[in-house]
């Protein structure tokens, strides 16, 4: 059974943090070749701190997907200008929002655990909406790649592109807003239930 849960940075066990940061290195450095900082075969940065909360998706106690949330009132990758060279002036609005970053689904583990038929992206996206709603946020902002945008669109989550930029690889990247309303939540639930019916 796939389980999804959130953990604050301060409560993250050592073994789980090592697993997370190792998987992030595999995804963002080894597979995607992003400009990220790596040390001891792990990827982490200054935003992995007490203001961060992580969503984990696990199967048989193995992490298969994850992302990091940071309230936009605290330093985060978008507001701090990490992506300024890729965009022409981006700024998050004032309000009670949360930024999502370092989102990944581990393809190798999905294959090894024979989960390729499971609606993992929809489950992860639903957990994002549920977390944001439970915490009283107005919505979620993130910067994503073009392939990730396609995954969002296929899931049924009606995200909106706030601004388009160009990465160091000359690929389109997007500042997106993710609404957390009932309609989007229900579409994701329907997609998950549709898969469950097929599997059943």
From Swiss-Prot:
Gene field: swrI
Swiss-Prot/TrEMBL keywords: Autoinducer synthesis, Quorum sensing, S-adenosyl-L-methionine, Transferase
Signal peptide positions on this chain: none
InterPro entries (alphabetical): Acyl_CoA_acyltransferase, Autoind_synth_CS, Autoind_synthase
Superkingdom in the source lineage: Bacteria
Recorded family membership: Belongs to the autoinducer synthase family.
tRNA-binding in keyword set: no
Cysteine disulfide partners in this protein: none
A Gene Ontology molecular function term of the record: N-acyl homoserine lactone synthase activity
Function of the protein: Required for the synthesis of BHL (N-butanoyl-L-homoserine lactone).
Swiss-Prot/TrEMBL catalytic activity: a fatty acyl-[ACP] + S-adenosyl-L-methionine = an N-acyl-L-homoserine lactone + S-methyl-5'-thioadenosine + holo-[ACP] + H(+)
One BP annotation, GO: quorum sensing
Protein name as annotated: Acyl-homoserine-lactone synthase
EC number, as in UniProt: 2.3.1.184
Entry-linked PANTHER family: ACYL-HOMOSERINE-LACTONE SYNTHASE, ISOVALERYL-HOMOSERINE LACTONE SYNTHASE
Native species: Serratia liquefaciens
């Amino acid at each position: 059974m796939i389980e999804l849960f959130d953990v604050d940075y301060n409560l993250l066990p050592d073994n789980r943090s090592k697993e997370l940061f190792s998987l992030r290195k595999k995804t963002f450095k080894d597979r995607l070749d992003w400009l990220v900082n790596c040390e001891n075969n792990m990827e982490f940065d200054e935003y992995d701190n007490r203001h961060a909360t992580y969503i984990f998706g696990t199967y048989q106690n193995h992490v298969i997907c994850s992302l990091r949330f940071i309230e936009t009132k605290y330093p985060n990758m978008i507001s701090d200008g990490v992506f300024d060279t890729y965009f022409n002036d981006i700024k998050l609005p004032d309000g009670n929002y949360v930024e999502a970053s370092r989102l990944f689904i581990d393809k190798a583990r999905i294959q090894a655990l024979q989960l390729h038929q499971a609606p993992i992206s929809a489950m992860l996206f639903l957990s994002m909406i549920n977390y944001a709603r439970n915490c009283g946020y107005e919505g979620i902002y993130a910067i994503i790649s073009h392939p990730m945008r396609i995954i969002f669109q296929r899931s049924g989550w009606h995200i909106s592109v706030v601004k388009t930029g160009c990465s160091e690889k000359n690929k389109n990247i997007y500042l997106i807003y993710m609404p957390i309303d009932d309609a989007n939540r229900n579409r994701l639930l329907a997609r998950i239930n549709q898969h469950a019916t097929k599997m059943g």
